[in-house]
Amino acid sequence: MDSSTDDTDHAEYRSTELGSESPAELRESSTEEYAVVADSTYSRAQFIEPSSLGYIHIGATVRPRSLPLTLLPIGREKTELLTRLKERARHLEELEAVETATIFETAAMPPLHRLPYIKEHKDSIHLARFDVAVLIETKSPAAAREVQETQAYQTLMDAIQNAATDVHVMASRNEKRIGDVDKTKQGVFIFNYFVADDPEVMLELFDYLAGSYVAETGLDNSTLLVPLDDENADYVAINNARWDIGILRFLWRELTNKSLRSFVQTNLKANQVGAMPVLYRLA
């Protein structure tokens, strides 16, 4: 499915000069319930058919760093935890219903509580300060539920819950996909945790946010995960992607690209969407 080539399947795209109207004025003038406020700087990302796999994302707050980026060692206790989790992930991969189970640790985390939408809705948002993340890929979305009933999964969860002060679990499916995320080799990985006033608006806006990163960073992979229908999740969606680049170079490119930063921040604000991006590496 290529969502960039058939706008009739989407809400109306309304092009406007950034800053010429307020977000409220733009919304009032829109005739579509799910219209996205965006300028024409970037086009929609080119998507392929969503994956048929199921996913279980686990985010855990174990011992997040006080600084957004630090190159210091993570400490003995956390190192031992990650070693245990990787061992238990290997046991999970022995299950017929599991494709892969991958453990991540943070490489960089911005001050999420200072982000505009997050700050404005601080009393209702689950802050994604997850310095440890697990992504389990299952044979199908239905299989994700089956995996959660297994002893191998519960053993993994016990190890996480014993070490973490906060845990969030989201059984999910793939809603939109640029390409598969290669988790077999090191790189800069992102889990971007989305919240929004209107989930449909967020999903529509994602086409343009992803398109901006394709254009500016050469992004060629991304899997946007949304909760299963019966899942009680705190996030509208979680996006996973990878860049084959070092963390310092990635951050420098992000901080110095004013055009990309302006486009993303302006359109998040205009659409009442919050994004909490956390960068990871393979543990």
Where are these regions (language model features)?
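Acidic (E/D-rich), amphipathic helical modules within compact regulatory domains
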Residues: 133-161
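Short S/T/G/P-rich N-terminal loop/turn motif that feeds into the first structured element of a domain
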Residues: 1-2, 6-131, 139-143, 163-283
